[in-house]
Amino acid sequence: MNKIEINAKWMQKTSVVWLGAMLCCLLWGSAFPCIKIGYGLWNIESADTSAQILFAGMRFVLAGILAVIFGSLLEGRFIRPEKGCASKIAWLAMLQTVIQYLFFYIGLANTSGVKASIIEAVNVFVAIIVSGFIFHQENVTAKKMLGCLVGFAGVVLINMNGMNFQMSLSGEGAIFLSTVAYAFSSVFLKRYSAKHNPVMLSGYQFIVGGIILSAAGFAMGGRLSTVSAEGVLMLIYLALVSAVAYSLWGMLLKYNPISRVAVFGFMNPVFGVILSAWLLREGAQALGPVSLVSLVLVCAGIYIVNK
């Protein structure tokens, strides 16, 4: 089996970056409503945290296996964890899979797909703060801070929908905490990809993180008693979302500046809102004036940060 050579200049082409990043955002945006649909197909209640964690673990173990297969086809050989990257895989597994999705799955079960998709967009702002003030990987300018404030205003506004001035810690609060974990994982993935295969890192961290989540969910009493063909297909789709999107995003980050790729992140809430409105029938909230203004503010904030 021959290795598929990835040309750095080809990966840096505007059309390739545009199409690749848009595909990632479309897949990630579809995850918001599809996870909620998956809960219904597997008969997982919104209060059944243990079953939600078990469901997440199963998804990511499968996603990791798919990513390793994908990476092996690209390399023309079976990809194994490279020497000296065990601790790096562990760090990514804890941040990108265990901590991020522990909060994400719990939060999504207690809020709407529309709200979740917009709040998740804040990870762009958090990543800039983390990379600038903690890891000193880039300068945090006044323009970037302005973008952060504009985007945060959008998050605050969406939580005022219907004159509701309160945020649920188990809902919107959990989704926000998941974005913080994702921001840290993005910084580490960019750093580690300089020396290691990003697809290999994504695949094995998914497997490790998925096993941890599965074990935790099972130990907490989580069980998935309702099995159907539709439920299995949805689980496979969600696994493909993670395997394809994270692997492709990691490759784009490897060959391009973070800002050039991150600017496309504004499409995550756009796709999330549209698909949630369509698949979850949240049209009243998704198409309401408050949600639309909130979405515009978040997208404007990301644009200001990256222009």
Kindly label every feature range from the protein language model.
Residues 2-57, 164-191, 234-235, 240, ...:
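Glycine-/small-residue-enriched transmembrane alpha-helix faces in small-molecule transporters
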Residues 25, 34-36, 64-68, 127-129, ...:
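Transmembrane alpha-helical segments that form core, pore/gating elements
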Residues 29, 33, 61, 93-98, ...:
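Hydrophobic/small/kink-forming positions within alpha-helical transmembrane segments
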Residues 38, 55, 107, 133-136, ...:
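Hydrophobic/aromatic residues within transmembrane alpha-helices
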Residues 41-96, 126-130, 181-185, 202-220, ...:
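Transmembrane alpha-helices of multi-pass small-molecule transport proteins
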Residues 58, 97, 101, 115-122, ...:
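Helix-helix packing/entry segments at the starts of transmembrane helices
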Residues 67, 129-130, 141-160, 213, ...:
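Hydrophobic transmembrane alpha-helices of multi-pass small-molecule transport proteins
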Residues 72-116, 120, 157, 238-256:
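Specific transmembrane alpha-helical segments of multi-pass solute transporters/efflux pumps
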